[in-house]
């Protein structure tokens, strides 16, 4: 079994508006994940004290990491990271398309890392989709297409994870769910596992989509006081096994 945790850390600013990288790392450590996918990570930004949050969290967890800047302003970067205790290899990092009619929107990107588990190699693609539905659709199509999910070897174990800013009613979610199985629905027992807002979670907008070669064993979100405080999202924890799913 492999435990994966995806978490929008809101630049490590909690619902109390306090910046605290340490408590974000504490929330993650409490779940003992093998693989961590983070969104909204600040690296060298003045607003969060110039700290490399990806490095700082990875250091506290004893993990290796890869970071992809969705956008860069001079020396300041903001984006997504994948951390793991397992052997890993960066496959690809790059931008996702924006909507041409909304050039002012925040740029988005994706990060692909191959991770060696005891059962074989697992590809993990981490992303954070935009807020505007038309932009989300373009990004979901790109992720499902030949440059990302479609570039993996046929039948290879792969998960696409992150803050999709989309519920099952959204077009972006449906595009991705048509290509892969969403973890909440693929788990043996169906779970709503809402992740936003952390203080009173009602929306499931953080997701894990799994290929046919990945079995979802369990899905959950922690509801302890620290998890509700450390970020405006809750982490989503998914236990996975590598191997083809048994048809229902």
Please report, for each region that a protein language model flagged, where it lies by residue.
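Active-site regions of metal-assisted phosphoester/phosphodiester hydrolases
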Residues: 1-35, 47, 59-60, 64-248
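A short beta-strand-loop structural module common to alpha/beta enzyme folds
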Residues: 37-42
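Membrane-embedded segments
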Residues: 44-46, 54
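Generic internal hydrophobic packing segments that stabilize the cores of diverse globular domains
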Residues: 51-54, 80
């Amino acid at each position: 079994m492999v435990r994966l945790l995806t978490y929008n850390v809101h630049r490590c600013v909690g619902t109390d508006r306090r910046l605290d990288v340490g408590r974000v790392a504490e929330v993650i450590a409490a779940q003992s994940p093998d693989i961590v996918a983070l969104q909204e990570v600040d690296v060298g930004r003045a607003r969060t004290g110039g700290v490399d949050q990806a490095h700082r969290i990875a250091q506290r967890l004893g993990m290796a990491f890869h970071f992809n800047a969705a956008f860069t302003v001079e020396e300041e970067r903001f984006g997504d990271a994948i951390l793991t205790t397992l052997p890993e290899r960066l496959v690809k990092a790059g931008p996702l398309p924006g909507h041409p009619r909304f050039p002012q929107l925040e740029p988005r990107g994706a990060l692909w890392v191959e991770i060696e588990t005891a059962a074989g190699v697992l590809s993990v693609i981490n992303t954070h989709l935009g807020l505007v539905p038309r932009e989300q659709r373009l990004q979901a199509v790109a992720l499902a297409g030949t440059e990302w999910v479609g570039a993996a070897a046929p039948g290879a174990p792969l998960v696409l994870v992150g803050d999709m800013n989309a519920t099952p009613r959204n077009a972006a979610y449906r595009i991705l769910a048509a290509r892969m199985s969403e973890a909440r629905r693929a788990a043996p027992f169906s779970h709503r596992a809402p992740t936003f807002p952390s203080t009173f979670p009602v929306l499931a907008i953080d997701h894990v989509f799994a290929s046919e070669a990945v079995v979802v064993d369990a899905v959950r979100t922690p509801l302890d006081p620290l998890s509700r405080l450390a970020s405006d999202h809750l982490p989503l924890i998914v236990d996975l096994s590598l191997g083809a799913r048994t048809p229902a």
